[in-house]
Regions:
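Conserved glycine-rich cofactor-binding loop
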Residues: 12-13
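Rossmann-fold cofactor-recognition segment
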Residues: 47-62
Length: 243
């Protein structure tokens, strides 16, 4: 195994935890992330097995910047799996869009990028006017997933040589998905691991929207260059940090 250094955000439970656990078991150098010290205790077992821990609440932009700074002091990451996500409430836009955008802009020399999308993105609206990026009010989960899927495609276009893909893990039985979710949890995290570390040609492709190992056609706005550019301009203005 070629050992890769991989950050998995939001890895205290659910899909992030499963991905971090699997990558660690495969011998990779994994950086796990929790939003606070209390949640970080759930990662003790992975840390004991050699995972490195970063802690920071992704609703706080300064915490995201601090984590990026800490990681930039170490050797570049071979991959980042942008897994952290919330499905309702005021944290939706800060956690699902602003945090992955800032990490993408700030982390230097990352080899591959994997962004967690959702089938919900098909119901998202490609409208940027009036979006509350700071989380003063509840955000639309569907819109947030459309935006992050478009971000993945924009990064693929602007950073040739850096595979950047979005993954729909399906409706899986995590805390977010609920116990009755019909999709396979194992398949839910396997695609993001494969995109992060595999040297198969398909895994090294870029600009894809993936579901259970297959490339699918995303919402039409995802590959609309004008929308991508508007999104990047909006996020750069909002954060003061350009991609």
């Amino acid at each position: 195994v070629i050992v890769r250094r991989i950050l998995v955000t939001g890895s205290a439970d659910g899909l992030g935890r499963a991905a971090a656990d699997t990558l660690l078991a495969a011998g990779h150098d994994v950086v796990v992330h929790a939003r606070n010290r209390e949640r970080a205790k759930e990662l003790d077992a992975l840390v004991e097995r050699g995972a490195r821990l970063v802690v920071g609440d992704f609703t706080d932009r300064e915490a995201v910047r601090r984590i990026a700074g800490e990681l930039d002091e170490a050797p570049p990451l071979d991959a980042v799996i942008h897994n952290a996500g919330v499905w309702r409430g005021p944290a939706v836009m800060p956690v699902n869009v602003i945090a992955p955008y800032l990490l993408t802009a700030l982390l230097r020399g990352v080899g591959r990028l994997v962004y967690l999308s959702s089938g919900s993105h098909y119901g998202g609206r490609p409208v940027l006017d009036g979006v509350d990026w700071r989380g003063g009010s509840a955000g639309s989960y569907a819109d947030s997933k459309l935006f992050v899927t478009a971000l993945a495609a924009a990064v693929a276009r602007l950073r040739p040589g850096v595979p950047s893909n979005a993954v729909d893990p399906g409706w899986v039985p995590t805390k977010m998905g609920g116990p009755g979710a019909p999709d396979d949890l194992e398949l839910g995290h396997r695609t993001q691991e494969w995109l992060a570390v595999s040297d198969e040609p398909a895994a090294l492709s870029t600009g894809g929207y993936w579901y259970h190992g297959e490339r699918r056609e995303p919402h039409a706005a995802v590959h609309d260059r004008a929308f991508q550019d508007r999104l990047l301009r909006t996020l750069a203005e909002e954060t003061g940090t350009a991609l």
